Regions:
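Core catalytic alpha/beta fold that binds nucleotide/phospho-ligands
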Residues: 1-124
């Protein structure tokens, strides 16, 4: 068993600018439909929720990059960050080529200016 960690922090204003300057094309490229629906339902804090999901995906990329076979590319939407019925975040890996992950623990936080994510990935 191998364990890797990943952490990422981002300014929320950068994500907001990316979304607004591309007329949502950024969202379509980076976030799944379920992620977009969740963030859009947050109204006043939607950019914080978009940013923390972006940060989470970056943290996961950092944690798994050394363990992946470079024969295939990982896309942003191969990793989905959702929340359970109690509001706790969890990760769905949608790319079937990523088979050697046993579990991913995730912690997300955001404030007015920053979003941060920390992940612990356990490999089989």
């Amino acid at each position: 068993m191998k364990i890797r960690t990943g952490t990422d922090i981002i300014e929320i204003s950068r994500v907001k600018e990316s979304i607004e300057s591309t007329n949502e094309k950024f969202c379509e490229r980076v976030y799944t439909e379920k992620e977009r629906e969740y963030c859009e339902n947050k109204k006043m804090q939607k950019y914080q929720h978009y940013a923390v999901r972006f940060s989470a995906k970056e943290a996961i990329f950092k944690a798994i990059s050394d363990e992946l076979d470079n024969k295939f590319e990982i896309n942003w939407k191969d990793i989905e960050i959702l929340n359970d019925e109690k509001g706790r975040p969890y990760v769905n890996i949608l790319n079937k080529k990523i088979q050697n992950i046993e579990d991913i623990d995730i912690s997300l936080s955001h404030c007015k200016q920053y979003a941060i994510a920390n992940v612990v990935v356990i490999f089989k």
